[in-house]
């Protein structure tokens, strides 16, 4: 069963953080690429620490080995300097899909005792 094998690596472009630049009086969208560099099909889900300010589209999906997806990370308008942005980040969570599963994302892959991995991408806001 796929769950007994730890999920392999993914790559993100950018690799370590996402940067948004002022002004923040309008919505910004930044694209990141997620690449499945493992030899197994994975299911991925994206979480944000601030759902009011940050959005990701598509928020989840399935990637075959070596397949990539472009995600749109959006930052809604906000009052820069008046809101706490120190802990803002998005987290990519991924797991191997069960053998024989259809290429359609299932939330239950992340429930139970299956192994999942995470990669945090902090958000930096330039004034």
Curated annotation (Swiss-Prot):
Tissue specificity note: Sperm.
InterPro entries associated with the record: Ig-like_fold, MSP_dom, Nematode_MSP, PapD-like_sf
GO cellular component, one term: cytoskeleton
Domain of life: Eukaryota
Keywords attached to this entry: Acetylation, Cell projection, Cytoplasm, Cytoskeleton
N-acetylalanine modifications at: 2
Pfam families with a match to the protein in the record: Motile_Sperm
Lyase recorded as keyword: no
Entry's Gene Ontology BP terms: oocyte maturation; positive regulation of MAPK cascade; positive regulation of smooth muscle contraction
Location of this chain's protein in the cell: Cell projection, Pseudopodium; Cytoplasm, Cytoskeleton
Key word Cytoplasm present: yes
Free-text function comment from the UniProt entry: Central component in molecular interactions underlying sperm crawling. Forms an extensive filament system that extends from sperm villipoda, along the leading edge of the pseudopod.
Name this protein carries in UniProt: Major sperm protein 77/79
């Amino acid at each position: 069963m796929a769950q007994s094998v730890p999920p392999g690596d993914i790559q993100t472009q950018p690799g370590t953080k996402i940067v948004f630049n002022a002004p923040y009086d309008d919505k910004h969208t930044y694209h990141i690429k997620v690449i499945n560099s493992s030899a197994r099909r994975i299911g991925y889900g994206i979480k944000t620490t601030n759902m009011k300010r940050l959005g990701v589209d598509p928020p989840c999906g399935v990637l075959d080995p070596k397949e990539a997806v472009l995600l749109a990370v959006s930052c809604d308008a906000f009052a820069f300097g008046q809101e706490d942005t120190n802990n803002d980040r998005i987290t990519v969570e991924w797991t191997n899909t069960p053998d024989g599963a259809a290429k359609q994302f299932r939330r239950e892959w992340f429930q139970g005792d299956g192994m999942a991995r995470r990669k945090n991408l902090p958000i930096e806001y330039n004034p």
